[in-house]
């Protein structure tokens, strides 16, 4: 396991032991099977609310501020974003009546609340990747859910009662990409739910404890540590003259022969035009290097062998244009480099890559239409070829619609 993966898993496992209110033990396989025979969701029966429903409560603002003041590489907004990332749920209430239909309450774009009924099929139990002694119960919606696509799949733990607090809770992940992506998701992301009739004061006490412990012990002191090392711009890889890379275009032209909507075959120029549309160009950088740890939280921007800029960063409030991703700002307000502000995904897929949107201001980053993408510079040539092949194949398929 790489040091980056170790860091992510360690942080995630530690955070979850605090964030998740119940000291949950795994559901025995026999109990899950017995429950599933009658009604897979019967074990969840009751009315529940996610902890995240109260994350913006005024009572918590001083808690965020006090903790952020002691965290040199997190603004108050950055700490709130980190906590939100860990505990957020796409619903504000969930009612299980013992059947396989769940009544979710969601908040609409205009701020109003709407109840959505979702019928699910049980897809079996899966051990947690980060804790093999515990199980997920996994579900898939019978029909597509138009109101909120992220409810199509969800995985949950059976409710448990915390011996110290007496609070009953469970943990859940929701998504639209499949059960596999949830089971193997970021260890930091597990939304805790408590009973809907739990007094607000008790919920806020629990949330205060979560914030304090996460800030003091669970988040990495240098939030860029997850990306440590040098990354290469995917466009730089696409432009690489090595035969192994250039052969990708020959392969794709044959694979998509006669399918160009303009008529005839695609050319290499056609494929590169799609690359530039999706990834942007390599005009601003060919490589970026993350240096995080031992009191540093820096990024070095490279063009070839020339250092373009170097700056320290703080994790900041999420950008409105990319609310689901981590956001960073240069610690020096006078820094006007291309990466003064950026929003970034976590590394994902194989080979690991990430996307980010950057600019000299948050507003400039929001206007970026492409999604600049980088892969780790130390991956093998074979992995680089696979990354370009998968990306370009996806672009070509998209261009035909």
What do the predicted segments below correspond to?
Residues 2-12:
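Bacterial N-terminal signal peptides that target proteins for export
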Residues 5-6, 27-31:
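Hydrophobic membrane-targeting and insertion signals
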Residues 31-49, 215-232:
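N-terminal helix-cap/turn-to-beta initiation motif at the start of protein domains
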Residues 45, 52-56, 228-231, 235-239, ...:
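Sec/Tat-exported extracytoplasmic proteins
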Residues 54, 97-217, 235-237, 280-401:
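Calycin-type beta-barrel ligand-binding domains and close structural analogs
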Residues 62-120, 245-310, 400:
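N-terminal glycine/threonine-rich, aromatic-flanked beta-hairpin/loop signature
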């Amino acid at each position: 396991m790489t040091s980056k993966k170790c860091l992510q898993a360690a942080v995630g496992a530690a955070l979850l032991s605090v964030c998740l209110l119940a000291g949950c033990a795994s559901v025995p396989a026999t109990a899950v099977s017995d429950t599933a025979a009658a009604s897979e969701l019967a074990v969840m029966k009751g009315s529940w609310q996610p902890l995240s429903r109260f994350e913006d409560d005024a009572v918590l603002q001083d808690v965020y501020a006090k903790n952020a003041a002691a965290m040199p590489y997190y603004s108050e907004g950055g700490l709130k974003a980190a906590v939100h990332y860990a505990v957020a749920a796409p619903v504000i209430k969930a009612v299980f009546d013992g059947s396989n239909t769940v009544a979710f309450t969601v908040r609409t774009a205009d701020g109003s609340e709407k109840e959505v009924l979702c019928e699910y099929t049980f897809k079996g139990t899966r051990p947690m990747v980060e804790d093999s002694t515990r199980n997920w119960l996994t579900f898939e919606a019978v029909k597509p859910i138009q109101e909120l696509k992220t409810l199509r799949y969800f995985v949950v733990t059976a409710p448990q009662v915390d011996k110290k607090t007496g609070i009953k809770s469970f943990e859940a992940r929701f998504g639209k990409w499949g059960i596999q992506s949830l089971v193997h998701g970021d260890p930091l992301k597990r939304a805790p739910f408590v009973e809907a009739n739990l007094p607000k004061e008790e919920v806020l006490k629990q949330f205060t404890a979560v914030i304090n412990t996460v800030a003091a012990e669970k988040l990495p002191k240098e939030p860029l540590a997850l990306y440590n090392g040098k990354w290469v711009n995917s466009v730089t890889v696409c432009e690489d003259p090595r035969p192994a890379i250039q052969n990708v275009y020959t392969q794709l032209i044959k694979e998509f022969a006669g399918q160009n909507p303009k008529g005839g075959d695609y050319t290499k120029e056609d494929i590169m035009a799609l690359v530039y549309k999706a990834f942007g160009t390599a005009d601003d950088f060919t490589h970026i290097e993350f240096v995080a740890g031992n009191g540093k939280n820096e990024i070095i921007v490279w063009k070839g062998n020339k250092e373009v800029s170097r700056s320290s960063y703080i994790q900041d409030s999420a950008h409105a244009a990319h609310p689901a991703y981590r956001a960073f700002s240069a610690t020096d307000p006078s820094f006007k480099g291309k990466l003064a502000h950026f929003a970034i995904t976590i590394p994902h897929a194989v080979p690991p890559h990430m996307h980010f949107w950057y600019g000299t201001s948050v507003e400039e980053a929001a206007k970026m239409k492409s999604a600049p993408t980088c892969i780790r510079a130390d991956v093998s040539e074979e992995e680089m070829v696979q990354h370009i092949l998968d990306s370009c194949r996806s672009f070509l398929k998209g261009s035909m619609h």
